[in-house]
């Protein structure tokens, strides 16, 4: 199908106001980088997501899912096919000791709702700048907690558009990994089972984690969050720091002087700058310590053609 055929097909199953053509993706990423999407869709209902995925599958159109854009780098060549934004699926509901949240809900907001209902278990997420869908996708975690600890189930859609309800065990949550990644599923919503707590203790823990995050992380610049996974027996930031790479810069992107595990966009940096800096850091750390640094951040899209 050519782009006009795809557009007509999408307009036959979706409201026109949720379809954007040749949409710049830098508007939707924390790094403020990225080329254009052929089609950028922002459905507001689960049924619309299913319809999009089914249409794409039947017509062999690639689909890329995008949440909050906080732990992703999109190359300047953009993304072919469909980019499906889940941010409008942002409902948050509570029932006794459970919270059900849409894929596009900010996990920070869900953590705050848990606190407001005096439920403990999601304090670790109070500073994670991602969506629920992204958090399940990568089993997000911080300061000793992770999604795996409190999720009950996730409602997902497979590549054919079929609806799946996956339990914690079926999600196969591991360190920054899940069956959602492995099988290219899309999360529609997730349910969390929490425990009744004490408001002052919950708030104190969230305040402590927020203070630690603000004191250690370079929140004053655009960034993609933590760049590398934790290698066994090491800390990525410490290895980078001991390699004297803090402040090292390629183009407009540099290794943060505040936290070596972060790379910040200090001067109109590009995805190409980010990728080159990542490869340089990996090379130096490998040479100096014989340790492979694997990326936590996802790098997607086409390389620029010029």
From Swiss-Prot:
**Subcellular location, in the record's words?**
Cytoplasm
Q: Where is the active site?
A: 176, 226, 296
Q: Which residues form the FAD-binding PCMH-type domain?
A: 33-197
Judged by the first EC level, this protein's enzyme class is oxidoreductase
Q: Which reaction does it catalyse?
A: UDP-N-acetyl-alpha-D-muramate + NADP(+) = UDP-N-acetyl-3-O-(1-carboxyvinyl)-alpha-D-glucosamine + NADPH + H(+)
User: What are the protein's GO molecular function terms?
Assistant: FAD binding; UDP-N-acetylmuramate dehydrogenase activity
Q: Which GO terms describe its biological process?
A: cell division; cell wall organization; peptidoglycan biosynthetic process; regulation of cell shape
Protein name according to UniProt: UDP-N-acetylenolpyruvoylglucosamine reductase
Annotated source species = Staphylococcus epidermidis (strain ATCC 35984 / DSM 28319 / BCRC 17069 / CCUG 31568 / BM 3577 / RP62A)
């Amino acid at each position: 199908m050519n782009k006009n055929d795809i557009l007509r097909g999408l307009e036959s199953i979706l409201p026109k106001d949720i379809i954007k053509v040749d949409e710049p993706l830098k508007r939707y990423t924390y790094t403020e980088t990225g080329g254009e999407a052929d089609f950028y869709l922002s459905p507001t209902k689960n049924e619309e997501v299913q319809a999009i995925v089914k249409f794409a599958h039947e017509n062999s159109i690639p689909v890329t899912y995008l949440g909050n854009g906080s732990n992703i780098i999109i190359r300047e060549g953009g993304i072919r096919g469909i980019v499906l934004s889940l941010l409008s699926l942002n409902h948050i509901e509570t029932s006794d000791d459970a919270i059900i949240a849409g894929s596009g809900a900010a996990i920070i907001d869900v953590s705050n709702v848990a606190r407001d209902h005096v439920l403990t278990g999601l304090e670790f997420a109070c500073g994670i700048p991602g969506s629920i869908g992204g958090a399940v996708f990568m089993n997000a975690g911080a300061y000793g907690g992770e999604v795996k600890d409190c999720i009950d189930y996730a409602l997902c859609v497979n590549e054919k558009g079929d609806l799946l309800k996956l339990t914690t065990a079926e999600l196969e949550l591991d360190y920054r990994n899940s069956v959602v990644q492995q099988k290219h599923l899309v999360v529609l919503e997730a349910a969390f089972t929490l425990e009744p707590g004490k408001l002052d203790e919950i708030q104190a823990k969230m305040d402590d984690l927020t203070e630690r995050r603000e004191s250690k992380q370079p929140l004053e610049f655009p960034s993609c969050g933590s760049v590398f996974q934790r290698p066994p027996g090491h800390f990525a930031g410490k290895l980078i720091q001991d390699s004297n790479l803090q402040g090292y810069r390629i183009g407009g992107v540099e290794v943060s002087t505040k936290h070596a595990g972060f790379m910040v966009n200090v001067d109109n940096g590009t995805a190409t700058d980010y990728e080159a800096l990542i490869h340089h850091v990996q090379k130096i750390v490998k040479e100096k310590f014989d340790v492979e640094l694997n990326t936590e951040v996802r790098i997607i899209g086409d390389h620029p053609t010029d």
